[in-house]
């Protein structure tokens, strides 16, 4: 498949009026194909692989939050990056997952062609699925280069999305606690 992606990048360069054989571009199709495979590696991963067995029994029933998880994704409409941070919380109900696994779940879904709204929901549903928790909250704030570099060219625009499941959706106190804690330095 990488050869096909590489050939496509070569054709794009030609269609732009460039010479893909000139010194500065000679290896660009191969590098771009390799970069695209990396930036979309989430398609090659699944939840079981990402968790790698790191689900543990626990009596803890208090909120678990992982804040400021950097994320890098590609807008499915323009193939341009969006860059931001995710905050993920869940209320355990008999089990917890390894700390790094929350970040790995974010990465698995972010490393696909995405829109932020779907990314937020996919992360929440995955955390709910693996923890069986009483609730899950995901908040993402990101800057979209498709809006900054082209179109309306708004350099300071940011997009925020949230998904609240279970107690985070049904209980305003739980939701507010999460929202307050992710804003605390």
From Swiss-Prot:
GO biological process: one-carbon metabolic process; tetrahydrobiopterin biosynthetic process; tetrahydrofolate biosynthetic process
Enzyme Commission identifier(s): 3.5.4.16
SUPFAM superfamilies reported for this sequence: Tetrahydrobiopterin biosynthesis enzymes-like
GO MF, any single term: GTP cyclohydrolase I activity
Reaction(s) catalysed by this chain's protein: GTP + H2O = 7,8-dihydroneopterin 3'-triphosphate + formate + H(+)
Gene3D superfamilies per UniProt: 1.10.286.10, 3.30.1130.10
Residues in the signal sequence: none
Disulfide bonds: none
KW Zinc (keyword) present: yes
HAMAP family per the UniProt record, alphabetical: FolE (MF_00223)
Protein's recorded name: GTP cyclohydrolase 1
Species annotation: Alkalilimnicola ehrlichii (strain ATCC BAA-1101 / DSM 17681 / MLHE-1)
